[in-house]
Amino acid sequence: MQQNQVKKGTKEMEFFTEYGDANRYRILEVIGKGSYGVVCAAIDTHTGEKVAIKKINDVFEHISDALRILREVKLLRLLRHPDIVEIKSIMLPPSKREFKDIYVVFELMESDLHQVIKANDDLTREHHQFFLYQMLRALKFMHTANVYHRDLKPKNILANANCKLKVCDFGLARVAFNDTPTTVFWTDYVATRWYRAPELCGSFFSKYTPAIDVWSIGCIFAEVLTGKPLFPGKSVVHQLELITDLLGTPKSETISGVRNDKARKYLTEMRKKNPVTFSQKFSKADPLALRLLQRLLAFDPKDRPTPAEALADPYFKGLSKIEREPSSQQISKMEFEFERRRLTKDDIRELIYREILEYHPQLLKDYMSGSEGSNFVYPSAIGHLRQQFTYLEENSSRNGPVIPLERKHASLPRSTVHSTVVHSTSQPNLGATDSRRVSFEPSKNGASSAGHPSTSAYPTKSIGPPPRVPPSGRPGRVVESSVSYENGRNLKEAYFRSAVSSPHCYFRPNTMTNPENRNIEASSFPPKPQNPVHQFSPTEPPAATTNQADVETMNHPNPYFQPQLPKTDQLNNNTHMAIDAKLLQAQSQFGPAGAAAVAVAAHRNIGTISYSAAS
């Protein structure tokens, strides 16, 4: 299956270019595997921080799994809290209609509470208190949003070496809205039995409350105190036996509220059990901690405290101030309207795609305005990550560290370059004057940035060329998109609005004859709110300026201002241009560097022309 994924991804990767996120994340190692897919640790090269990238395979193979993923990504977007894991991004798929896998970028947590408990038998009372405090803070935030997690357990609480905990895995979570009863019932509850509240064992109650999460937190905290699960039941009956062995036989009024006939009969006929004192069960624990634990593990859900009430317990004196603990706004009913209707795979794909766009604001804006193309051919990083994930999956079982594949090219080379008309606003002409010449910065091997002989030998005045802006791509590679995007904007603009290309252009030497290599790339400067400046004609040398123009240039506050000239040859915006460096050098009094600057001005309102060199 992995080989098929590689073959399928090879063709798609040919269409991905550098201005996506393909180079943003550098894969380090596989840190987890499961039926859903793989989790890898990676470095975000933009910020330098470590992240976890979760690859979820075949999202839409089963509708129930797809709904669980949709529910989780939606809730994690809505529940932003320091004690809840954060989704940093979701990678944009290559196709809106046909994508099957998704890549979710999380903040990286080194371990989970299950591993912490298993590996540490020397946790202090301060550890116990801080762990419970963080879990209750997260639970308070969720419950104020009317969200029930329903699957709290140590493996679903991530941990760092600095004792920071974060709740994760909201796939089974549900939202209760104001127009529904305070107690709700969902038939698909399949949470881990060991941390399941007694009212859920055997479907005892037809309805249940957020107190089910409070019970789970109590079970987790007891495991933190002792280092082993509190109620490791092997079946529903065994689970009830373990619970009643510690808590004693429930009250008769509690048993009368049981809806399941068999369960009610089992509890009624159960021999009388007395509760075990918690100080005897947890002899080394803080007495204040045990008093709170006994409240969390009340058999009757009505006797359990809310998370806010638990945070106000004397156990957290000096640590918790309930008034400063954040609360969540209630979630809009429209966010989860999909839970009330029958959905097809295409419906869920559209909903998940909409969630992905929440992490790509410009594309979300286009989607909401209806200007997005139906086929969704935006650049994507999925191909790049698919290759790395597949490589790590195939080699993770071998001995020794797995070295991830490195990207061979910074961008995909092309054999031909096409120009595309991009209508732009008028730009001020920043071409050089006769007193200022443009000097190209030579590369290490003595060639210009385009890979041709350097023109830096031409003398320059004390006032140098306009300040360079770091280019968005290496010289000689494609740094602008040749694909038109809706109303004339580039696809690159939709991703990196702040990216500015290098303020110079490339030209070929006199020996080049291939017409495909005569195209140049003309970078645009930021627009200035001035009157439009007439363009130079490529057939008329810059020497056509008059003495009056020279005076105007000298008196203008902008040292790079080019005076207006008579319009001699209006170029059609649809014309594909190629600048002959030899002709410009012969006709221009500025030399090759000046000719290049004139070429920039000549292309100001014509469009973006891309240049490519083989890698």
Curated annotation (Swiss-Prot):
Subcellular location, record wording: Nucleus; Cytoplasm
Motif TXY in this chain: 187-189
Top-rank taxon: Eukaryota
Pfam family, one: Pkinase
Domain called Protein kinase: residue spans: 25-316
Phenotype of gene-disrupted mutants: No visible phenotype under normal growth condition, but mutant plants show reduced sensitivity to microtubule-disrupting drugs. Short roots with abnormal twisting (e.g. leftward skewing) in media containing microtubule-disrupting drugs (e.g. oryzalin).
Compositionally biased residues, Polar residues: 445-459, 510-522, 532-544
Modification after translation: Dually phosphorylated on Thr-187 and Tyr-189, which activates the enzyme. Phosphorylated by MAPKKK20.
GN (gene name): MPK18
Positions of the UniProt region annotated as Disordered: 414-483, 510-544
SUPFAM superfamilies, A to Z: Protein kinase-like (PK-like)
One MF term in the entry's GO annotations: MAP kinase activity
Enzyme Commission (EC) number: 2.7.11.24
BP GO terms, sorted: cortical microtubule organization
Protein name, as recorded: Mitogen-activated protein kinase 18
Subunit structure: Interacts with PHS1. Binds to MAPKKK20.
Annotated Pro residues bias: 464-473
Catalytic machinery residues: 151
